[in-house]
């Protein structure tokens, strides 16, 4: 019996039983209105309108097609004052009303100051008031129209100049002739040429003769002083601007005012003749001229490159480049000599105290042997010093046996004729091989060929 039943029919019966149970469990009460109907108790959360919920199709936020256009309500006449009521004219006006009427009827009298202001701002001549009183309203139209900013009237008076500046500018041109008469002819010619030439040609004049314009602040008086130096009269001079006091030689009238506020700064060579003719001790000062200080063209002379200082282990480049066979070297004698002390000149020691490094005279055995005679480019500490102010010349040679030989080339001496013998007596172990390269030295440069052995005491002890 159970096997013959159809499973589909059994499932349908189960679904029906469940639906019936659900209907029985539902509470008995007022049914909710359908979504299409309006309920004033509901409020939509989307649009905020009453009568429907947010899930209703009547909400315009979900369905714009169902949005209702607000209908215009009927015209309400009487609320708007389309025809305003005109005030009735009083039959017996009071004294106050009479005065007001007379003031309105009378044209407004404009004083001359208002007419001038109207003519200034608007740029139009003031119109004449009409007899019906309309001119009073039209004349005040310039107050309503936006106009440009008020012009700022500046006084035509010139600012006061400094009395000291005015006095100097007045006396500058008057006393220029007397100053030119008192100057030297060379300076007078340079002043006349600098004033007649253009700005470009004026810059090529002499550095010491050209008076450069300087200017003055209102407070202090910075003066520009050009001082030629004593140390370099032949090559070039270095001019340094300094803040100095007024000079006694040149008066204030010799200070021409600067036409250009900021002239270009140029650097030109300084001729030595001009500095000697004017005197090395003369100072040129240029006084105040205008408000802002002008940059005076400082005539920077040609500065020769300084010779680099050599350390104790540095080799000069000239010696490396010109290190040939038999090339002598100029060496300054040391301030104190070890072998010949009394013959040392104190003047030479004060002028150029030479810093001569020590040289390894005995080379190590690992080095390859050099040629028989070769000029050594390193300076050597000579044991003897030479009298006089002339430098010593020392020639270094490399021998075959690995030793170094040096020849001292000195100028003629007047009070020490026994010096060659003394040198030969002190160095008896000088090899004869080193005498041959001395012939290669030109006789015009060398006076004596004093050969001094430069081998150390260790090498002497090894030979013995």
From Swiss-Prot:
Transmembrane segments: none
Biased composition, class Low complexity, residue ranges: 180-197
Biased composition (Basic and acidic residues): 74-89, 97-114
Renumbered residue ranges of the record's region Disordered: 1-42, 70-389, 411-437
A Pfam entry, by short name: zf-CCHC_6
PANTHER family referenced in this protein's UniProt entry, alphabetically: FAMILY WITH SEQUENCE SIMILARITY 90 MEMBER A11, PSEUDOGENE-RELATED, PROTEIN FAM90A1
Family per similarity comment: Belongs to the FAM90 family.
Additional note from the record: Primate-specific FAM90A gene family, thought to have arisen during multiple duplication and rearrangement events.
Record's protein name: Protein FAM90A12
Gene this protein is translated from: FAM90A12
